[in-house]
C-alpha cells in the first residue's frame, strides 16, 4: 500500500508547478526563461534588475544556482556549465530574488484531508562557504515557527495542484522585503530531508504521541496497522525549538531560553 499523489502531479519542473499556483492566486517568484545569451539582459530589465537568481528548472540542493548582480555575471555562470557539458541553455531560469525568511512547510494528507503539518525556518546551511550560492541543500540550523499565513498558503498551494491530496507534500516558501510570502516549490509525494529527524525528536524527547512522527505514521498506514488517521492539526511541534547539526558534531535540540540536549 502506498500513499502517493497521482504520478501526473509529481513534476520535477519548477516552472510547471508555478502554473496552477498562479491560477489559484498564490504568489510565486517572477521568473523568466531564456533561449540564448542575448535574452539574458532583457530578462534582467524585465525583472527589475539584479540581484536575481540563476537556477536550474529542476533538481534539489541549489542545483546550478547563483545570485547574480547583473546580466554579465549570469551569462558567465550559464556559459561555464554549458562549456563543462553539465547543462544546456534550456535547463536554466532567471528568478526574482526574495531576500528574507526561507521556510519549509511539511504536510501530511489522507484522502483529501489534512492530517498534520509543521513549519520551520531554515537558518544556516552546511559548508555554505564552499558553494557560490551559499545553498548546500539541507540546513544545519532550523527552528519551528508558527505562522497562520504560512499554514493558509501551504494548504491552498497543495490543493491548487491536487484536489484530493494523499500522502506527504513539502512546500518551500520565501519572504520578500515587505513580509509577503511566495511559494517557490512543492515536492509532491516526498518528505523534506529533516522530517524524519523532527519525528525522532518528537517521539524520543518531546514524548508526543507516535503519530506526530510523520514517517512513522506514513509507515503504519502503508502496513495497514492504522486505517483512518485522526487529524492532529497544524503546528504539531512547539514553536521556537531548534535543531542544530553538522558533520562530525552530532545533532542537538535547542531553545533560546538556554535549553539544549544532544539527540544523536
Regions found by a protein language model. Give the residues of each.
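Short amphipathic alpha-helix with an adjacent loop that forms part of the alpha/beta core around
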Residues: 41-47
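ATP-dependent carboxylate activation and anion-phosphoryl transfer catalytic cores
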Residues: 145-264
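Conserved anion/nucleotide-ligand pocket segment
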Residues: 50-71
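Conserved N-proximal alpha/beta basic substrate-recognition cap immediately N-terminal to
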Residues: 1-35, 42
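Short acidic-hydrophobic, aromatic-tinged amphipathic segments that line or gate anion-handling sites
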Residues: 32-36, 66-69
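Phosphate-binding site of ATP-dependent enzymes
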Residues: 69-71, 75-133, 137-158, 162, ...
